[in-house]
């Protein structure tokens, strides 16, 4: 079983965990409809970067 040689101080422990936090996903706003969507994904209306790329079910 692995055993550490020296105890890690609270400061070093905190530095080690500094990147473990979660971030909110980056949202983009569609210029044509104004809806928010995930970056690099199409909006719920089927628009991507100002162009209609997918037909909606009601169309």
From Swiss-Prot:
Taxonomic source organism: Thiobacillus denitrificans (strain ATCC 25259 / T1)
Stretches for region Disordered: 1-22
Biological processes annotated in GO: translation
Entry-linked Pfam families: Ribosomal_L32p
Listed HAMAP family: Ribosomal_bL32
One GO CC term, this protein: large ribosomal subunit
InterPro entries, alphabetized: Ribosomal_bL32, Ribosomal_bL32_bact, Ribosomal_zn-bd
Annotated family: Belongs to the bacterial ribosomal protein bL32 family.
Keywords (A to Z) from UniProt: Ribonucleoprotein, Ribosomal protein
Molecular function GO labels: structural constituent of ribosome
Residue runs in coiled coils: none
Protein name per UniProt: Large ribosomal subunit protein bL32
């Amino acid at each position: 079983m692995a055993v550490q040689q020296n105890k890690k101080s609270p400061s070093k422990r905190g530095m080690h965990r500094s990147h473990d936090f979660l971030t909110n996903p980056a949202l983009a706003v569609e210029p044509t409809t104004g809806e928010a969507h995930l970056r690099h994904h199409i909006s719920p209306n089927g628009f991507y970067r100002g162009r209609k790329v997918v037909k909606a079910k009601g169309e």
